[in-house]
Design a protein with these regions (language model features):
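Alpha-helical interface subdomain recognition
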Residues: 1-86, 108-113, 120, 124, ...
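N-terminal glycine-rich flavin-associated loop
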Residues: 89-112, 138-141
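Short Gly/Pro-enriched turn/cap motifs at secondary-structure boundaries
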Residues: 94, 136-139, 163-166, 180-182, ...
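A gly/ser-rich beta-alpha-beta helix-loop segment of oxidoreductase catalytic cores
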Residues: 127-149
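Flexible, small-/acidic-enriched active-site or ligand-binding loops
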Residues: 143, 196-225
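Long, acidic (Asp/Glu-rich), low-complexity accessory segments flanking structured domains
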Residues: 220-239
Length: 396
């Protein structure tokens, strides 16, 4: 059983601790790492199950639309992702994409948008997607080429999106396109586009190291009502960054879940595997490795739940979320690699729990901003907040 002493930290309220306990019991009964080859159907099934059991109520903000509260509680999102990730990467993915795909609607949607989409998300009746990346514009959002030209009370979209999670199974997509109000990032707007809209097609399904629904999208003369725009024209970059600020911290939490499962597997292995007349755990080398794994996990968790707590206090957490995402994913990679090593040859057998975790975490170090992008964000934030002293160095 995983160490849950972190739940005693002051970042959490009693409601968070109670929720984690209920979810852990639910996941133990309803979530399996085995989902077969059809990840599309497995993902749909997980979304329906998460909706029917009430967990998707935490993915949106708005009690009027079925949400658990009027605002998205970041600590709750993080605890749910960490707990689900301990059991199944696909279950974590299914929950997370419902939140990320609809997050822009929670934050910037009109009343009509919220009425139409959020309640369906909560019930697990609709699947959401967040379409930002392009073939030539991943981390560099300002280089976006997909364009939306206004034509009366409609916009006409042309261009492509790629690496879109839930691509091919989503019922609607939050799509970002260049509308030209200003150069660079200030000339982007966000739109809600339903699957099946004429001029919108899925042109490629993408297979990746940790299987989940992923696709390349193409828009060719795709007409959408101007009323489908989220926020004001030219506000798309703000919409994207605000949404990512909420959910980037939760990526760190998913990494914690993977790492915690790996540590659990490693501890069990160390205590039961015998060689040279003693268990692995009796060797000082093994003890040192386990100590490093546990310490790294706690350090990453402290950064993650600090960022979540700060965001729930209404603070801007661009730097803190980047620190959490970078540290948790990189640390989890190290912990999982150490667990694989502890299992020896068994650790690289396909579908072994630690082999599966190894594939899951490698992708997470890239999704929603690679480690190198997080480093740039952190550096930009600390440089922005530092005033030059103005003192010239003295000569000896």
């Amino acid at each position: 059983m995983s160490d849950k002493s972190y739940l005693k930290w002051p970042f959490f309220e009693q409601r968070h601790r109670a929720l984690e306990g209920v979810l852990d019991a639910w996941a133990a009964e309803h979530v399996s790492q085995e989902h077969g080859r059809d990840v599309d159907e497995a993902c749909r099934t997980l979304v329906r199950s998460l909706g029917a059991s009430g967990w998707l109520a935490h993915a949106i903000g708005g009690i009027a639309y079925g949400g658990a509260s009027d605002v998205i509680d970041t600590r709750t999102i993080c605890l749910i992702r960490e707990t689900l990730a301990r059991y199944s990467g696909l279950a974590d993915f299914a929950f997370a994409m419902q939140g990320l795909g609809s997050g822009a609607i929670t934050l910037f949607g009109s009343e009509a948008h919220k009425q139409r989409y959020l309640a369906r998300i909560v019930r697990g009746e609709a699947i959401a997607a967040f379409a930002l990346s392009e073939p030539q514009a991943g981390s560099d959002v300002a280089a976006m080429q997909c364009a939306a030209v206004q034509d009366g009370d409609h916009y006409v979209l042309d261009g492509e999106k790629t690496w879109i999670s839930n691509g091919g199974i989503a019922d609607f997509y939050v799509v970002f396109a260049r509308t030209g109000e200003a150069p660079g990032a200030r000339g982007i707007s966000a739109f809600i586009i339903d699957a099946g809209t004429p001029g919108f097609e899925i042109v490629e399904r993408i297979d990746v190291i940790a299987p989940h629904p992923l696709a390349r999208l193409k828009f060719t003369g795709c007409r959408v009502p101007a009323s489908s725009r989220l926020g004001d024209a030219g506000q798309g970059f703000k919409v994207a960054m605000a949404t990512l600020d909420v959910f980037r911290t939760s990526v760190a939490a998913a990494a914690l879940g993977f790492a915690r499962r790996a540590l659990d597997e490693a501890l069990e292995r160390a205590m039961t595997r015998k060689m040279f007349g003693q268990t692995l755990a009796d060797f000082q080398l093994t003890q040192a490795k386990l100590a490093q794994m546990a310490t790294g996990l706690d350090a990453a968790a402290l950064l993650t739940y600090r960022a979540a707590w700060q965001r729930d206090q209404g603070e801007r957490v661009t730097k803190e979320a980047a620190m959490a995402k970078m540290t948790a994913t990189e640390t989890a990679q190290q912990i999982i690699d150490a667990a694989v090593q502890m299992f020896g040859g068994l650790g690289v057998v396909s579908e072994h729990p630690v082999e599966r975790l190894y594939r899951e975490i490698r992708a997470l170090r890239i999704y929603e901003g690679a480690t190198e992008v997080q480093q740039l964000i952190i550096a930009r934030e600390i440089l922005r907040n530092r005033e030059p002293s103005g003192d010239a160095p003295t000569k000896a």
